[in-house]
Amino acid sequence: MEDRRSKSDEQFVAHFREKYDARLPVWALTELMELGQLSILYRGLRQQDAEEIARAFGAPTKRIMASWLASLNYVRNVAAHHARLFNRKLQHAPARPKTGQVPVLDHLRDVETPKGVFGTYSALAVIAHILPSIDPETDWHRRLVELLRAFPASPALSVSSIGVPHSWESLDLWR
């Protein structure tokens, strides 16, 4: 973090360097952190603070939110390195909340196949659930549905390769 802080050309970092000492307040420090670092920081938070953050993003517990962050960090890294994500088995699949904790994600518990549990779909479902807490006007979920509908039909590779459940498009999460 020291290296990122010292090399940062962000205006708020320069302001703190000039006006105060080298120690950045936590809100400024988190702006410089990578997603993986934020995930680690989150796991180290006090239970009460972590649960407040989890609730803000629609996660029922600190454990679930920590799992989601680790999974999204993994997905982000795969995508950033231009690796195949489509039908990949996720090494860090997002934890599935207990039935009733997050009703729009209850369908994730109905699946026990490796594709259903560890497929890319589970991460996409978590993203679709979290995004409205960041941007209530998001239409990302609708655009994803359209993108997957446009996927070419092929016996060798289909949308089911990512672990989508039967009739997934009719789920409330995607409407």
Predicted feature descriptions by range:
Residues M1-R175:
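Long, contiguous internal "core" modules enriched in hydrophobic/ aromatic residues
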